[in-house]
């Protein structure tokens, strides 16, 4: 915090400018001195500043800053605004900060229904199993009899129903983070190596991996299963999660078989 404040302060930057201008006025050796001082300063920064990757690209790095400390945040942004070049402010936050149930289970509160504030539990009673519930149970059952079956997701193990699989078969579960393209290409590599990958992803998010589905999986005619959650109209997740384009953009791809179960029984059979 101290270093970030010092480096972004008016006094420090003005002093740095004046020193450089003064040294440059020295005949013959002035420019060389400025360069050597700059290199020495950069070497020291490499040791003490975590954001040197950005500094090396000419972007001033400020942080890390506690994103829940409003006073520090305001001060840091004011300091950044005073600079006349690119600045990156690194802010650290904790999802659900200040509400114990959300801090304990942040993914549960990523998208929520009405819930009891005291307990954090949903007020919506679950009467029937969902497609996600059935997929979650079935994929674990299939993995029992097929040791080659592996599961891939892009930072959505809960939403896609792979949470149970990740606990039952941690060595066969791969979460690649928010990178659908990488999830698809990784699955292609697994299939080429003889595994049976199942990529569980939201329908609208698979759009980001369209080129990989086409080029890395289907043109290679590799055996990869794409289990698309939130296919069709899904009102509760908002307009960005409506999976209304998958049939269109997947049906034009060669070596692709598309199945759309109309009920839970069909879903189980199609997975088999």
What role is predicted for each listed range?
Residues 7-52:
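Alpha-helical membrane-targeting segments
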Residues 2-21, 108-114, 247-248:
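Acidic, Ser/Thr-rich peripheral helices and adjacent loops at domain boundaries
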Residues 45-51, 56-76, 82-271:
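Thiamine diphosphate
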């Amino acid at each position: 915090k101290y270093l970030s404040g010092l480096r972004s302060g008016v006094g420090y930057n003005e002093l740095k400018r004046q020193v450089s201008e003064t040294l440059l006025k020295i005949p013959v050796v002035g420019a060389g001195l400025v360069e050597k001082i700059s290199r020495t300063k950069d070497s020291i920064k490499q040791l003490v500043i975590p954001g040197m990757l950005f500094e090396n690209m000419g972007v001033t790095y400020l942080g890390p800053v506690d994103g829940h400390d409003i006073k520090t945040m305001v001060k840091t942004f004011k300091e950044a605004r005073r600079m006349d070049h690119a600045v990156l402010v690194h802010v650290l936050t904790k999802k659900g900060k200040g509400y114990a149930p959300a801090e304990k289970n942040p993914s549960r509160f990523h998208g929520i229904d009405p819930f009891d504030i005291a307990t954090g539990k949903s007020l919506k009673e679950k009467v029937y199993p969902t497609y996600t519930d059935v997929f979650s149970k079935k994929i674990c059952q299939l993995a029992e009899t097929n040791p080659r079956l592996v599961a891939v997701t892009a930072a959505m193990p809960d939403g896609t129903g792979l949470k149970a699989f990740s606990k039952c078969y941690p060595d066969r579960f791969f979460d690649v983070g928010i990178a659908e393209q990488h999830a698809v290409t990784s699955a292609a590599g697994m299939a080429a190596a003889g595994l049976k990958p199942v990529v569980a992803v939201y329908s609208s998010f698979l759009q980001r991996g369209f080129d990989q589905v086409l080029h890395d999986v289907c043109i290679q005619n590799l055996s990869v299963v794409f289990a698309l959650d939130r296919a069709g109209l899904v009102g509760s997740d908002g307009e960005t999660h409506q999976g209304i384009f998958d049939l269109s953009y997947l049906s034009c791809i060669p070596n692709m078989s598309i199945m759309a179960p109309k009920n839970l029984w069909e879903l189980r059979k199609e997975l088999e």
